Design a protein with these regions (language model features):
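Beta-strand-rich domains and repeat architectures in extracellular enzymes and scaffolds
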Residues: 67-103
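Boundary at the C-terminal end of the N-terminal hydrophobic targeting segment
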Residues: 43-45
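Multi-bladed beta-propeller domains
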Residues: 49-74, 100, 107-124, 131, ...
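Predominantly five- to eight-bladed beta-propeller fold
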Residues: 47-52, 102-103, 179-230, 236-240, ...
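Conserved beta-propeller blade repeats
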Residues: 72-87, 120-138, 155, 162-180, ...
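Sec-dependent signal peptide recognition
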Residues: 25-33
């Protein structure tokens, strides 16, 4: 939207620009200011939140302060490669100023001597898992499933789902993958009328309307998708039409689903 507004402003300036030098200078100054402003907005949007180099400097003396805690990275999930020589893990960094976080992926050798940063952009990358016998790493970013070499190169987008993917688990033979997606659910909380999309009031019709920190207006379902050379398809909902969630909120994850060794059967946890 800002880019289109900038184009409109520049077109207006140059359309009505005359050969009057003072007018020209003024117009060019306005155009330059607009360009600088747009560049600043883009630069801010791309700011990468990463590791704080000197956490101790943030502390007040030898005290542990809230600022110190926010400056520390928070280690998330970790997975060892099939040969046991490398571990891929996730670390979250936070910016109090921007009020947002950034999840990054790293690898480290089992002896701790060789560490590599895989995430190099401002987009968060999460849920890393080894695939193809340890040759590649699958992960989530911007709601889609991706894969990359173990050194972070050759990144490929595997899915193009209209619904954000929240988790995944590949079958042992690598030919299929479970994708976790949340679907709209309005059995407990009535959907807002079409002419009042921004209404904040809720009409609750069932006691199971909330999970700790969020209202139940969607439920997670597992989809089984085929893995091909062209990527991963949208998959089939294995509990289609059922008003249940799998994994189960508020604490469940992909650990509540498991493939059989022959990749033919899925065991899952669901409250029915």
């Amino acid at each position: 939207m800002r880019v289109e507004s900038l184009k409109t402003t520049l077109n207006f300036i140059f359309k009505y620009l005359t050969l009057n030098i003072p007018t020209m200078n003024k117009a060019l100054s306005i155009a330059a200011a607009a360009l600088i402003g747009c560049a600043s907005i883009n630069a801010e949007a791309q700011t990468m939140i990463g590791k704080t180099t000197n956490v101790a400097a943030i502390s007040k003396g030898d005290r542990m302060t809230p600022e110190t805690l926010w400056a520390m990275g928070r280690v998330g999930g970790a997975a060892a490669s099939p040969d046991g020589k490398t571990v891929v893990y996730q670390v979250g960094y936070y910016s109090v100023k921007q009020n947002k976080s950034h999840q990054m992926l790293y690898t480290v050798s089992a002896d701790g001597k060789l560490q590599r940063t895989l995430t190099t952009t401002a987009a968060s990358e999460t849920d890393a898992a080894w695939i193809e016998g340890g040759k590649r790493i699958a992960f989530l970013t911007k709601g889609q499933l991706w894969s990359m070499n173990a050194d972070g190169t050759d990144r490929r987008q595997l899915t193009k789902s209209d619904i954000d993917i929240e988790g995944f688990k590949f079958s042992p033979d690598g030919k299929k993958v479970i994708l976790i997606k949340s679907l709209p659910y309005h059995e407990s909380i009535q959907k807002n009328p079409d002419d009042l999309p921004l209404a904040t009031g809720r009409r609750i019709t069932d006691l199971n309307y909330r999970h700790w920190d969020h209202y139940v207006e969607s439920v997670a379902h597992p989809f089984v998708a085929d893995v091909t050379e062209n990527g991963v398809d949208d998959g089939k909902d294995i509990i289609e039409g059922e008003p249940f969630e799998c994994p189960m909120a508020p604490f469940g994850g992909v650990e509540q689903l498991a493939w059989s060794p022959d990749s033919r059967t899925i065991a899952y946890t669901c409250r029915k």
